[in-house]
A protein has these predicted regions:
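Active-site metal-binding motif and surrounding structural segment of the metallo-beta-lactamase
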Residues: 82-86, 94-139
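Bacterial N-terminal signal peptides that target proteins for export
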Residues: 2-16
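Accessory terminal helices/loops
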Residues: 22, 28-45, 251-253, 264-330
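Conserved beta-strand hairpin/beta-sheet module of binuclear metal-dependent hydrolase folds
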Residues: 55-103, 208-222
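Metallo-beta-lactamase
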Residues: 50, 57, 84-86, 90-94, 145-279, ...
Length: 330
């Protein structure tokens, strides 16, 4: 399937090549855990605000606004070429998007702007409303399908959780994409090549992996996070595919990983995520073979893996991972 574009593409100095290189991955099966909001937040925690004046230089062409380990704040990327700039994720709602725009102005003077999202969850996507009107939005078709099918419900559910979230998401308006791609898009920002790659369902159905070729920097979204337990938020998350995708991310040979949440790190973040998920998968298979129910398995693993990973945050997601692998186990 080729790209879908509108007239705004004619204004760009960016060269876009769409590559149908990777086979689509099958959908997650039915009878799944209940949909829940990712990266828990309650009123006792800091409000999920993108940090101002904290932007770091990750590599020659890449900057990141770190999340400060605040739930529902993503790591945000700014990739600067000689002709155009690509922004990766936007924070929750227009207020956070305005912060991103101010930080962007400190590191790039380009007026040609592109925006992509690692996945559809509100803290990654809804800040784009505050971006300049000429910003070109690009994302995978699989991700847009999730936006259309799920995002209104996610925004509503987030808004009901705390006063902070309700205020941030008030009057949020969807920003439709200008470019959709099926499996891969390649962007030339001017001396900087960026690959946007959809590999199939993992954390969500539409996870978008962004690789800055010259700098060896990989933005993984929530497919890889640093010292947070991996999040299985709804019926489209797939443990089996997630493990396969981690293997494929290794093939990029990244030097630096900008995870969806948590500190920027090196390629070892991929192997750490893999080690955890494989351990959960293996233990689930063992307990299911012993006749344990899904709920019994989830509660046993919650205790076991909290003890094994005492410095990882949001342990409530252990049970959801266990239930996912239980469904997938033969």
């Amino acid at each position: 399937m080729g790209p879908r574009t509108n007239h705004r593409q004619s204004k760009t100095l960016l060269v876009l090549t769409l590559l149908g290189l990777l086979g689509a991955v099958g959908a997650a099966i039915a009878n799944e855990p209940q949909e829940t909001a990712p990266m828990g937040h309650n009123q006792s925690q800091p409000p999920p605000l993108v940090q101002e004046n904290k932007t770091i230089k990750v590599s020659e062409h890449v900057y990141a606004i770190p999340d400060g380990r605040v739930n529902l704040v993503p790591n945000i990327g700014i990739i600067v070429g000689s002709r155009a700039t690509l922004i990766v994720d936007a924070g929750m709602g227009p207020r956070n998007g305005q912060t991103v725009v101010r930080e962007l102005a400190k590191v790039s003077k380009n007026t040609d702007l592109y925006f992509t999202t690692t996945h559809f969850h509100p803290e990654h996507m809804t800040g784009v409303q505050a971006f300049p009107a000429n910003t070109i939005v690009i994302r995978p078709e699989a991700q847009q399908e999730e936006v259309d099918r799920k995002q209104p419900e996610f925004i509503h559910n987030f808004s009901q959780r705390t006063a902070d979230l309700k205020a941030l998401l008030q009057d949020v308006k969807p920003r439709p994409p200008d470019i959709l791609f099926d499996h891969e898009a390649k962007l030339d920002l001017g001396g900087v090549t960026v690959r946007l790659v959809w590999l199939g369902p993992a954390h969500t159905r539409g996870d978008n992996n962004i690789f800055v070729v010259e700098d060896g920097v990989l933005f993984t979204g929530d497919v890889v996070i640093n010292r947070f337990f991996p999040i299985f938020p709804d019926a489209d998350a797939s443990g089996k595919n997630w493990l396969s995708i981690l293997d494929q991310l290794d093939e990029f040979h990244p030097r630096t990983i900008v995870p969806g949440h948590g500190e920027v790190g090196d390629a070892s973040l991929i192997s750490k995520e893999r080690t955890y998920l494989k351990a959960v998968q293996s233990r689930v298979v063992e307990l299911k073979a012993q006749g344990k129910s899904s709920e019994e398995t989830a509660q046993l693993l919650l205790v076991e893996f909290r003890a094994k990973y005492p410095d990882w945050e949001n342990p409530g997601w252990i049970a959801d991972a266990a239930k996912r692998f239980y469904i997938e186990a033969k």
